[in-house]
């Protein structure tokens, strides 16, 4: 595809993400997508067969990017304790930054997508695998069930994204700091370990 065609396709995808985010899949219209992108309706069909096809592409792209991002966040071997908390903070902040960079795509990919529940299960599984590998490296308590930790992390990220990130109430850095402080240091004052 020529560069003009690539740019046109990107504009249509961006406009579609916004339309689906605002109206939902069923109420979104191809006529509104092309209007937002500055195209005619026939030009839409040069790039996509249907509204379903462009929605599916947006979802597939979001899911694959989330998975790649999650897989890339595995902590490397040889970190000291202080560096582990810094790297965990960086990893959680990176996830929130990703979800914040295209709020329309996040809304449809993480919340409106009929496959969102399965996507989050897949995300939790990749996180669990990362956490178990990091646990074997001695970064986390050996008695923690990393499946539970992964599910908690996904739930926290999902809820905080919907409540604070997509609404603009909090930014990725502050959300990441709160999540990491809770998970790494807990809610009790220093020195009050419950084990």
UniProtKB/Swiss-Prot annotation:
Domain HTH tetR-type: 6-66
GO molecular function, one term: DNA binding
Record keywords, A-Z: DNA-binding, Repressor, Transcription, Transcription regulation
One Pfam family linked to the record: TetR_N
Gene Ontology CC annotation, any one: protein-DNA complex
InterPro entries with a match to the protein in the record: Homeodomain-like_sf (IPR009057), HTH-type_Tx_Regulator (IPR050624), HTH_TetR (IPR001647), Tet_transcr_reg_TetR-rel_C_sf (IPR036271)
DNA-binding residue intervals: 29-48
PANTHER family xrefs: ACREF/ENVCD OPERON REPRESSOR-RELATED, TRANSCRIPTIONAL REGULATOR, TETR FAMILY
Protein name: Uncharacterized HTH-type transcriptional regulator YdgC
Naturally occurring in which organism (per UniProt): Bacillus subtilis (strain 168)
Lineage of the organism: Bacteria, Bacillati, Bacillota, Bacilli, Bacillales
Gene it is expressed from: ydgC
